[in-house]
Regions:
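Structural preference for beta-strand elements that scaffold enzyme active sites
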Residues: 7-9, 36-39, 108-112, 156-160, ...
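Conserved, mostly hydrophobic/aromatic
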Residues: 11, 29, 41, 81, ...
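Metal-dependent phosphodiesterase/phospholipase catalytic core, i.e.
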Residues: 54-173
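Short beta-strand/loop segments at the ligand-binding rim of alpha/beta enzyme cores
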Residues: 4-9, 152-156, 170-181, 220-237
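C-terminal active-site rim and adjoining tail of enzyme catalytic domains
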Residues: 180-268
Length: 268
């Protein structure tokens, strides 16, 4: 019998097993029959290239010298970073075009929009209508470039971000693209943003849904109930153990954003 729910979303191409956010990671994740979708992180360089890279700088993931590794990615050109490889691998920091080309069209893609380096960007929700318009305007140049690449493929695309401005800009640029607010512990804000942007999903952290014993919290139950009533999915991040996967499946989540397919037991 085939597996139905929860779906398994390969976090950065299964970061625990592969050099994260690289072309090789995409190929490995896509070749695993447990994978339903792949999550990747999009960033801007100083010369307006869209790369796939998680961190603000290169210090954690590359052996770049301090003059480069301590500089924010958005202040570096693609030529300045393209020669460095991820971790102990030979995999370079890829362009979004390269990563998407490595993922089969049949595989879903969760594109997380990271901070593009513009000043005045508010993390999380924005207070009022005027501020939301301004936030969307600040995000728009980067979002347009990322979506120009992503929507040129046939992938089932879901755009997520911790920044409301990114969601607003996505809605303005491509109204038909599915979006999902990423939230930390403020799940109520996640519900508000999901309603505001008619989101297809909400992406909360595990500890916003489960207590230390693995039992669904009252806030988690409420979030799941509201989301499912509105026909929205809940995709939880970041799953690192089979115990977490089982508890989240019992809670009724729709997707597991996982660092390895090995953490997803067959009985979920």
């Amino acid at each position: 019998m085939g597996r139905t729910h929860p779906r398994v979303i390969a976090h950065r191409g299964y970061a625990a097993d592969n050099a994260e956010n690289t072309v090789a990671a995409m190929r490995a994740a896509a070749s695993d029959d447990r994978t339903d979708a792949i999550e990747i992180d999009a960033r801007a360089t100083s010369d307006d290239r869209v790369i796939v890279f998680h961190d603000d700088d290169l210090s954690r993931l590359t052996d770049a010298p301090p003059a480069v590794s301590d500089t924010p990615v958005w202040e570096l050109s693609y030529d300045e970073i393209s020669g460095y490889t991820i971790g102990d691998s030979d995999e370079p920091i890829p362009l979004l075009t390269e990563v998407l080309a490595a993922i089969p069209d049949s595989m879903g893609v969760n594109l997380e929009l990271k901070h593009p380096g513009r000043e005045g960007l508010t993390f999380g929700a924005v207070d009022d209508d005027d501020a939301r318009i301004a936030a969307a305007d600040r995000w728009r140049p980067f979002v347009e470039r990322a979506l120009d690449v992503a929507t040129a493929t046939d992938h089932d695309l879901l755009v997520s971000s911790f920044y409301e401005g990114a969601l607003a800009a996505t809605r303005g640029c491509e109204p038909g693209v599915s979006v999902a607010p990423l939230v930390t512990d403020d799940v109520a804000t996640g519900s508000i943003l999901a309603t505001r942007y008619d989101a297809a999903a909400i992406h909360p952290p595990i500890d916003a849904l489960l207590d230390e014993s693995g039992t669904t919290t009252a806030a988690g139950d409420q979030l799941l109930d509201r989301a499912h009533t509105a026909d929205r999915q809940i995709n939880a991040w970041t799953v690192t153990t089979q115990q977490e996967a089982r508890a989240l499946a019992r809670a009724g989540v729709d997707g597991l954003i996982a660092d390895s397919p090995r953490v997803v037991p067959a009985d979920t």
